[in-house]
Amino acid sequence: MGGSLRVAVLGAPGVGKTAIIRQFLFGDYPERHRPTDSPCLYRPAVLLDGAVYDLSIRDGDVAGPGSSPRSLEEWPDPKDWSLQDTDAFVLVYDICSPDSFDYVKALRQRIAENRPAGAPEAPILVVGNKRDRQRLRFGPRRALATLVRRGWRCGYLECSAKYNWHVLRLFRELLRCALVRTRPAHPTLRLQGALHPARCSLM
């Protein structure tokens, strides 16, 4: 058994957080958007280079029942997010929405500012979703990737949840970073996907 990892998938409403998770776990895509009204916790097992890891993937806001926050001002105190022991973060934005990118920018800053003293730094992967709408994007990929990687010191990747493009790569990169930080001598990891459908429970 390889151990366990806690992952939080965050971002503005409508950017495709749930769609990304469902493509990774179940290989399906909801054609009709349904807002995530309550946080959802998925518990899949994944195989990485022959070792099985139990994942805990949190989808949606962490403020409790109710609609997802539409701005950072609507979030509760970061110290109450129950995310301080999270091993890795996925911050999702819509490549056609500059507002969703600003949301991720502010969210990343809050996560950094409120990490408990002495706690290991949790890797953050910024993900630009809806790559299938490339012609409508608000900014060039190269410039955004450079800003995130060099300025924010976070990982950067773009995907299309609709067409399942780079979704597996997204989680492979995230888990690789999380495990390398906890196990510096760990060899290159190869994510082979979820072993079985995840259990989902509303919190």
Swiss-Prot record:
Binding positions (GTP): 11-18, 59-62, 129-132
Entry's localization field: Cell membrane; Nucleus, Nucleolus
Reactions mediated catalytically: GTP + H2O = GDP + phosphate + H(+)
Residues modified as Cysteine methyl ester: C200
Membrane-protein topology: Lipid-anchor
Keyword GTP-binding tagged: yes
Gene3D superfamilies the record matches: P-loop containing nucleotide triphosphate hydrolases (3.40.50.300)
SUPFAM superfamilies named among the record's database cross-references: P-loop containing nucleoside triphosphate hydrolases
Propeptide: 201-203
GO annotations of cellular component type: nucleolus; plasma membrane
S-farnesyl cysteine-type lipidated residues: C200
Top EC class for this record: hydrolase
Keyword terms, alphabetized: Cell membrane, GTP-binding, Hydrolase, Lipoprotein, Membrane, Methylation, Nucleotide-binding, Nucleus, Prenylation, Tumor suppressor
Protein purpose: Potent inhibitor of cellular proliferation.
Name of the molecule in the record: Ras-like protein family member 10A
Gene that produces this protein: Rasl10a
